[in-house]
């Protein structure tokens, strides 16, 4: 009985060590920072032409200033991860995607919606929208291929 117990204990210890190594590898290695500013076309591309579905994002913050000078920010990590994961079932998944779709809209204060601040109900007229044209916007975060 002692030999079996020692074997099971050894396997358990090895598995725990492997899980710890995998956790450290995923959380502390391979993350590359990115930063886009107002007017940039935001394109995420895999370095080795692999599927964009394997790209993951972390700590992605969209920050913008409204026409009154107030600073607003929203965490868009989940949005970007879901956009990338959406390519999983594609027959020929691309190696890049551009924020804003096919029109490749440059980063601006409307790239992500913060309800009550820059949504359609709040910015209701063309005059309101023109006030937003010179507002600064940034998108920062970390990205990696898994």
UniProtKB/Swiss-Prot annotation:
Alphabetic keyword roster: Host membrane, Late protein, Membrane, Transmembrane, Transmembrane helix, Virion
Compartment(s) where it occurs, according to its Swiss-Prot or TrEMBL record: Host membrane; Virion
Spans through the membrane: 7-27
Induction and repression of expression: Expressed in the late phase of the viral replicative cycle.
Membrane topology: Single-pass membrane protein
GO annotation, cellular component aspect: host cell membrane; membrane; virion component
Family according to the record: Belongs to the asfivirus E146L family.
Name of this chain's protein: Uncharacterized protein E146L
């Amino acid at each position: 009985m002692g030999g079996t117990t020692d074997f099971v204990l050894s396997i358990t210890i090895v598995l725990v060590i492997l899980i710890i190594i995998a956790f450290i590898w995923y959380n502390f290695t391979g993350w590359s920072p990115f930063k886009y500013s107002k007017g940039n076309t935001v394109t995420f591309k895999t370095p080795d032409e692999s599927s964009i579905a394997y790209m993951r994002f972390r700590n992605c913050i969209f920050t913008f200033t409204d026409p009154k000078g107030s600073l607003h920010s929203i965490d868009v990590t989940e949005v970007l991860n879901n956009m990338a994961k959406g390519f999983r079932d594609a027959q020929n998944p691309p190696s890049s995607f551009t924020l804003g779709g096919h029109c490749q809209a440059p980063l601006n204060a409307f790239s992500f919606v913060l309800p009550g601040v820059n949504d359609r109900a709040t910015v209701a007229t063309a005059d309101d929208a023109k006030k937003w044209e010179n507002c600064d916007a940034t998108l920062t975060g970390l990205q990696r291929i898994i």
